[in-house]
């Protein structure tokens, strides 16, 4: 029968600065099943290095190491991690209990990496192990609430949870007083009597005396190997020791993944303020994405509704801009439309139902001691019907008022609010660019289209605007209502030909253009889509900055938790387990930040509606996009810290100061 542990000519050296220090110099050793071995030696003798190799926390530079006849050198990292979990139990001088976890969770920690599905019996098993060391009543305490001796007993309970064949104890009484040291050694002695193989490192002869075999080391070599004449009689076992081959569940298995999620949440909540500050960048980024995209989408929908109200059979005729020697002459500099053009186009019946000219300008509106700067629109008689602008209160001006150039006005709700507050504006006299006008109507509320307030407007008769207020003899444009929607293209071609003929323009002249509402809708939709993408891109920069902040915090976390990583690997965590844990933590922080940012973004969007009156629309797409992007950001920026954590060697991580 092969030995349980067998070393042949093992050598191990470490590089310290520019010097190479030999820790083990050709050590050969055999340990049988059921032995209690104490390895003694002064500091620097190589005893801890030997224990680390025996416990699979380190690998030799030269020589061979076999466990139950299997060469460790042929095993993969995952296979060695599995052996640490199933075969070995570790008791450390520094206890290595995770301070943010309860005693019960510390004891159950090896089960996370065991490949065994979590069950209701797991808690009972943890309680049973704590009862063995006399700490069942401390189940929900944290390590900081225990004495040193109690913490070491918890470490022993943790080492036993997987029922290992071998207990590796590294100076188990080094940090304890005499009474606690005796209690720990009684527990180890009892485990040996139950058949456990125990390999213990100590520098105290009275502690080594508990063992049946004492190996003494000096300068990396074994100088003595003594066995007691009266060794403890162990229960006989005829069955050979076989290395376990338990399959590890895939990382996406929900029960295994839930363990990593629980661990990640504990890590996040353990440093609440730091986690919150780390999430802040993601929170701002997601809130910006939601608010900006809601604003852009709201503007697009508002414009679509307004264009829809205008009708799909509407044409807009505008004078184009000509260039002389490369210099633009401005809109309508060549082709200028007059009221006569409007009358001529309106006469194209039955193709055309109505036509109305418009002029645009700015107005300084004054009432009493209040004044307001607004947009001025001079419109024809049919404009109110054609553009859904008929007053909700009061009336539209008459054809006679238009002909007489009467000074009457329809004002938007914004102008009414600024000048009159809550009082009725009808019949009141206001000054528009220092000219007295009588308010005869209140225009229907249309709200905002993006940042543009459609209710900040004053409408007056076209003739009044041209000849009394603005002093113009040409129009800004003409709106044409086609009799039937399916004849819009025909009407556009007919009107274009008519204008060229009337103004004696060549066929290829581009000094005017005609657009229907569909074209305008496409143009505005394209513009708002571009603006939404631009705003979203700007907001996404915040997410990237937040992701960099997450990466920075995770790198700091890896450094702070180096010993914890070493402990987890000693308990059987694979490289992929460590990587997954840190990725879940990173993604968890960004997702939490994303959810908070989502709520803040929705609040900001609703606030813009309530306070500024802007049209906003929160789409499911923007919510899903922001949430997905925050998760991807966490995974992407958490990858490097996770890889760095996974690459740490167990023994180096445990030694980290």
Curated annotation (Swiss-Prot):
Keywords: Antibiotic resistance, ATP-binding, Cell inner membrane, Cell membrane, Membrane, Nucleotide-binding, Translocase, Transmembrane, Transmembrane helix, Transport. It is a multi-pass membrane protein. Residues 5-244 form the ABC transporter domain. Gene3D superfamilies: P-loop containing nucleotide triphosphate hydrolases. PROSITE patterns: ABC_TRANSPORTER_1 (PS00211), ABC_TRANSPORTER_2 (PS50893), MACB (PS51267). GO terms for molecular function: ATP binding; ATP hydrolysis activity; transmembrane transporter activity. SMART domains: AAA. Its main location: membrane. The keyword Lipid metabolism does not apply. InterPro entries: AAA+_ATPase, ABC3_permease_C, ABC_transporter-like_ATP-bd, ABC_transporter-like_CS, MacB-like_ATP-bd, MacB_PCD, Macrolide_Exporter_MacB, P-loop_NTPase. It is found in: Cell inner membrane. One of its GO terms (cellular component) is plasma membrane. It comes from the Bacteria. Its EC number is 7.6.2.-. The chain crosses the membrane at residues 276-296, 533-553, 591-611, 620-640. SUPFAM superfamilies: P-loop containing nucleoside triphosphate hydrolases (SSF52540). ATP binds at residues 41-48. One of its GO terms (biological process) is response to antibiotic. The keyword Manganese does not apply. It is an enzyme of class 7 (translocase). Non-canonical ABC transporter that contains transmembrane domains (TMD), which form a pore in the inner membrane, and an ATP-binding domain (NBD), which is responsible for energy generation. Confers resistance against macrolides. Homodimer. Belongs to the ABC transporter superfamily. Macrolide exporter (TC 3.A.1.122) family. This is Macrolide export ATP-binding/permease protein MacB. The gene is macB.
């Amino acid at each position: 029968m092969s030995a349980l542990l067998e070393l042949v000519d093992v050598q191990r050296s470490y590089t310290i600065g520019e010097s190479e220090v030999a820790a083990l110099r050709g050590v050969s050793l055999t340990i049988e099943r059921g032995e209690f071995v104490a390895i003694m030696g002064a500091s620097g003798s190589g005893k801890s290095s030997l224990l680390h190799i025996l416990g699979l926390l380190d690998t030799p530079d030269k020589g061979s190491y076999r466990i139950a006849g299997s060469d460790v050198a042929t095993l993969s990292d995952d296979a060695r991690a599995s052996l640490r979990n199933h075969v070995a139990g570790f008791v450390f001088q520094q206890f290595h209990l995770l301070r943010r976890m309860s005693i019960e969770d510390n004891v159950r920690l090896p089960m996370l990496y065991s490949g065994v599905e979590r069950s209701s019996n797991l808690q009972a098993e943890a309680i049973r192990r704590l009862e063995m060391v006399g700490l069942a009543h401390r189940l929900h305490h944290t390590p900081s609430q225990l004495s040193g001796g109690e913490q070491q007993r918890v470490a022993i309970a943790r080492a036993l949870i997987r029922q290992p064949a071998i207990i590796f104890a590294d100076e188990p009484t080094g940090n304890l007083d005499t009474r606690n040291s005796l209690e720990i050694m009684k527990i180890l002695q009892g485990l040996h009597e139950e058949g456990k193989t125990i390999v213990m490192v100590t520098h105290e002869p009275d502690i080594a005396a508990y063992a049946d075999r004492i190996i003494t080391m000096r300068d990396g070599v074994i100088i003595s190997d003594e066995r007691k004449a009266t060794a403890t009689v162990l229960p006989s076992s005829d069955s050979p020791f076989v290395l376990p081959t338990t399959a590890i569940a895939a990382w996406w298995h929900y029960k295994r993944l839930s363990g990593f999620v629980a661990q990640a949440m504990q890590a996040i909540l353990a440093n609440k303020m730091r986690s919150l500050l780390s999430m802040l960048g993601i929170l701002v980024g997601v809130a910006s994405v939601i608010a900006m995209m809601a604003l852009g989408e709201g503007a697009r929908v508002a414009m679509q509704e307004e264009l829809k109200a205008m009708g799909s059979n509407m044409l807009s005729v505008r004078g184009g801009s000509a260039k002389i020697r490369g210099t633009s002459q401005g809109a309508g500099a060549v082709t200028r439309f007059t009221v006569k053009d409007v009358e001529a186009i309106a006469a194209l019946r039955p193709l055309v139902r109505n036509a109305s000219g418009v002029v645009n300008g700015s107005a300084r509106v004054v009432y009493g001691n209040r004044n307001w700067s607004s947009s001025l629109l001079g419109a024809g008689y049919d404009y109110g019907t054609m553009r859904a602008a008929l007053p909700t209160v009061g009336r539209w001006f008459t054809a006679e008022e238009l002909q007489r150039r009467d000074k009457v006005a329809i004002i938007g709700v914004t102008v009414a609010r600024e000048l009159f507050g809550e009082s009725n504006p009808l019949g009141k006299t206001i000054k528009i660019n220092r000219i007295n006008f009588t308010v005869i109507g209140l225009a229907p509320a249309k709200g905002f289209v993006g940042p543009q307030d459609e209710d900040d407007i004053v409408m007056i008769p076209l003739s009044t605007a041209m000849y009394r207020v603005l002093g113009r003899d040409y129009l800004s444009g003409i709106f044409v209502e086609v009799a039937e929607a399916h004849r819009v293209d025909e009407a556009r071609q007919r009107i274009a030909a008519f204008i060229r003929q009337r103004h004696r323009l060549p066929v290829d002249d581009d000094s005017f253009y005609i657009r229907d509402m569909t074209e305008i809708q496409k143009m505005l939709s394209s513009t708002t889509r571009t603006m939404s993408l631009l705003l979203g891109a700007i907001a996404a920069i915040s997410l990237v900055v937040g992701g960099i902040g997450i990466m920075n915090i995770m790198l700091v976390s890896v450094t702070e938790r180096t010993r914890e990583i070493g402990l987890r690997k000693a308990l059987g965590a694979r490289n992929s387990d460590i990587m997954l844990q840190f990725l879940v933590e990173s993604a968890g922080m960004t997702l939490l930040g994303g959810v908070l940012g989502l709520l803040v973004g929705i609040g900001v969007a609703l606030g813009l509606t309530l306070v500024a009156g802007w049209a906003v629309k929160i789409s499911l797409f923007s919510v899903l996009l922001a949430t997905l992007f925050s998760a991807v950001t966490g995974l992407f920026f958490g990858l490097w810290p996770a890889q760095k954590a996974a690459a740490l060697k167990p023994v180096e991580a445990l030694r980290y100061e």
